[in-house]
Amino acid sequence: MQWLRTVAALREQVASWRGSTIGLVPTMGSLHEGHLSLIRRCRQECDHTVVSIFVNPLQFGPNEDWDRYPRDEEGDRALCEAAGVDVVFAPDPQEMGADPATAGDRTWVMPPESLLQTLCAPHRPGHFRGVATIVLQLLNLVQPQRAYFGQKDAQQLAIIQRLVQDLQIPTTIVPCPTVREADGLAYSSRNRYLSAVERQVAASLYRALRRGYDHWQAGDPSAEGILAAARAELERTPELRVQYLELVDPQTLQPLSEVKDKGLLAIAAYVGQTRLIDNLLLSPEGVDPLPQEQQSAVPPSPKRGRRPLIAIDGPAGAGKSSVARAVAAQLQLLYLDTGAMYRAITWLALQRGIPLDDAEQLTQLAAQTQLTLQSGPSADEPTRIWADGEEVTQAIRSPEVTRWVSQVAAVPGVRQELVKRQRLIGRDGGAVLEGRDIGTHVFPDAELKVFLTASVGERAQRRQHQLQAQGQVVSLEELKAQIEQRDRRDSERLISPLRPAPDAILIDTDHLSQAEVEDKIVRLYRQLLERSGAAHFDII
């Protein structure tokens, strides 16, 4: 895969593909399962796949979130590599002529006024002008036969379709269904802004849309009835601040009084400070089915030629390490404690007086330190680890290291160095890896992904018991505060933030024994092997 940043390099590569079918997937990065569904379809239908990653300043208003929009270049690179993308085009604003300081004097593409009278356009003046300008630029640079856009951004889709039609651009715009989580929430990069409570509130957007759809399916085609049904559902969630709820024609975006053939029921609402949009097509074809929990709990078949990898992620204190060790022992797989690697670098930095905000020194430390890991003699004992020949197995579990490890792990250079080592160890499969971004970044192609979680109180108690066993006394309240602070750091960092992979199986360990959690994962692994007919792997 090539990662290109300049127009010249992109043009040179595209020219070499002359005579082949090229597909374009335009994105703003911070990739998730919605983007990956577009990429997979593009790869199925085209000889070459180009993914653009560009957080477009021209489509953000003065008080919007351009400066804090999620960016995860390392994670995006790994996902694109795993998905088989040929080229990622990731220019900066200057390369695209989109520097806000000088953009006022550039050529703009103005969508038809009739498409800007409803939905998001009145609330985001200039937004779709910025979208249309950059999309036209990308179509001109890549000259794809096909370009893939998600139905979730329905107004954008309608505008791009009209743009291509009016300007006679020889590109087929391919609409792709909205991809949702099990509770209906549409995948969005802005979902990262949501707290756990806000995440539950956000799920009511889909419930409201579905209520309107069901009302239409029951035989009432009137906009009044459909909107009233959706609105009644929204009123059950007062935490939502609805910006608009509208029923329009999917192509013209003009308001409908009734749905005769097709309609677009669309919503925008604020959950806390986060603005979310969603929509449903009201059409005879019906609504795309939600992913069922039973389906999401069935892992995909393992990659040919390697034993399956198990990726276990989750917040501090969720029980990842002890569970991963035990699962690896039961299945006779290699266990790799990635967290111990970050702890070792943190401990060394503290010992040597390296400032924890000095990214350059920390990166150099990670690159130069020789780390040696060895599984403990039993599943009950932690991984033994040596840093430059000195065993630091116990030292890296100190409260001071625990306090600072997430800050060190957030340094891009440190992550890059350690992830390279982790990938070398796990590339042949047959391993259990645990951490915070194994399934989303280190091994996004892992065959089995698990996300363990537990309440702050439960995790604090577990940590207290660990420390007491080591002869250390720390109050429960202090541990709770440390865990909450670490959760914030891990989930809000820009580089590989803590989040479940889209296809991860979530296990809440609050009311489960360790043995019960282990049993769940072992059964899922064996189920994976049975589905693939992989008896030749000779696991236990």
UniProtKB/Swiss-Prot annotation:
GO terms for cellular component: cytosol. PANTHER family: CYTIDYLATE KINASE (PTHR21299:SF2), CYTIDYLATE KINASE/PANTOATE-BETA-ALANINE LIGASE (PTHR21299). Pathway: Cofactor biosynthesis; (R)-pantothenate biosynthesis; (R)-pantothenate from (R)-pantoate and beta-alanine: step 1/1. It is found in: Cytoplasm. The keyword Glycoprotein does not apply. The active site is at H35 (proton donor). (R)-pantoate binds at Q59, Q156. Residues 1-280 are annotated as: Pantoate--beta-alanine ligase. The gene is panC/cmk. Beta-alanine binds at Q59. GO terms for biological process: nucleobase-containing small molecule interconversion; pantothenate biosynthetic process; pyrimidine nucleotide metabolic process. Residues 281-540 are annotated as: Cytidylate kinase. This is Bifunctional pantoate ligase/cytidylate kinase. It catalyses: (R)-pantoate + beta-alanine + ATP = (R)-pantothenate + AMP + diphosphate + H(+); CMP + ATP = CDP + ADP; dCMP + ATP = dCDP + ADP. Catalyzes the condensation of pantoate with beta-alanine in an ATP-dependent reaction via a pantoyl-adenylate intermediate. Catalyzes the transfer of a phosphate group from ATP to either CMP or dCMP to form CDP or dCDP and ADP, respectively. In the N-terminal section; belongs to the pantothenate synthetase family. InterPro entries: Cyt_trans-like, Cytidylate_kin, Cytidylate_kinase_dom, P-loop_NTPase, Pantoate_ligase, Pantoate_ligase/cytidylate_kin, Pantoate_ligase_C, Rossmann-like_a/b/a_fold. Keywords: ATP-binding, Cytoplasm, Kinase, Ligase, Multifunctional enzyme, Nucleotide-binding, Pantothenate biosynthesis, Transferase.
